[in-house]
């Protein structure tokens, strides 16, 4: 089976792809009847992010169900051992994203950094997933769109941590060398952790 990689496309084509995802996934809301040009409420930045997060969560849910049905990758306690070897992002109290102690700029910085850290795992998901390739690609691409939206919203982008290239190369090699069971386990853990991360992010976006 041949898999498509975003590295095969030019930056322009990739950017157009990201815009296409937003345009097709989130049509401009209009009234149910009458003049479509009147009474239209434009989406705010927070509204767009909320809808995009919900969209990604829906795709994650579909992929998790497919993995459970096809590969028996459901909620498995054995995966805890594999998870210890992964550096998947998660939100904590100190990140300022919870209702108690909420800090918008600190939270935005942490969510942006976390999504940046997820990218290598989501690229692996897109390249290696053996089920619904479109859903896998959509999770990777849509998360990139969300990342760009958050970068535009935040004021402290200098504080966003970008993964060290040499570390990413080493991690990529480690992921690529995995055998089938561990590869499926890594993908499932990535989906679970991203789902948790986005659910907390969604709550934070709603109070921004």
UniProtKB/Swiss-Prot annotation:
* Assembly notes: Component of a hexamer of two molecules each of IL6, IL6R and IL6ST; first binds to IL6R to associate with the signaling subunit IL6ST. Interacts with IL6R (via the N-terminal ectodomain); this interaction may be affected by IL6R-binding with SORL1, hence decreasing IL6 cis signaling. Interacts with SORL1 (via the N-terminal ectodomain); this interaction leads to IL6 internalization and lysosomal degradation. May form a trimeric complex with the soluble SORL1 ectodomain and soluble IL6R receptor; this interaction might stabilize circulating IL6, hence promoting IL6 trans signaling.
The record's keywords, sorted A to Z, are: Acute phase, Cytokine, Disulfide bond, Growth factor, Phosphoprotein, Secreted, Signal
Q: Which residues carry this modification: Phosphoserine?
A: 77
Domain of life of the native organism: Eukaryota
**What is this protein called in UniProt?**
Interleukin-6
Q: Which GO terms describe its molecular function?
A: cytokine activity; growth factor activity; interleukin-6 receptor binding
Which gene is annotated as encoding this protein in its UniProt record? IL6
As given in the record, the signal peptide range reads: 1-27
Report the principal subcellular site. Answer: secreted
Q: Which cysteines are joined by disulfide bonds?
A: 68-74, 97-107
UniProt lists the family membership as follows:
Belongs to the IL-6 superfamily.
Query: What are the GO BP annotations of this UniProt entry?
Result: acute-phase response; glucose homeostasis; hepatocyte proliferation; interleukin-6-mediated signaling pathway; liver regeneration; positive regulation of cell population proliferation; positive regulation of multicellular organismal process; positive regulation of receptor signaling pathway via JAK-STAT
**Cellular component per GO?**
extracellular space; interleukin-6 receptor complex
What this protein is reported to do is described as:
Cytokine with a wide variety of biological functions in immunity, tissue regeneration, and metabolism. Binds to IL6R, then the complex associates to the signaling subunit IL6ST/gp130 to trigger the intracellular IL6-signaling pathway. The interaction with the membrane-bound IL6R and IL6ST stimulates 'classic signaling', whereas the binding of IL6 and soluble IL6R to IL6ST stimulates 'trans-signaling'. Alternatively, 'cluster signaling' occurs when membrane-bound IL6:IL6R complexes on transmitter cells activate IL6ST receptors on neighboring receiver cells. IL6 is a potent inducer of the acute phase response. Rapid production of IL6 contributes to host defense during infection and tissue injury, but excessive IL6 synthesis is involved in disease pathology. In the innate immune response, is synthesized by myeloid cells, such as macrophages and dendritic cells, upon recognition of pathogens through toll-like receptors (TLRs) at the site of infection or tissue injury. In the adaptive immune response, is required for the differentiation of B cells into immunoglobulin-secreting cells.
- Which cell locations does it reside in? Secreted
What Pfam families does the record tag this protein with? Answer: IL6
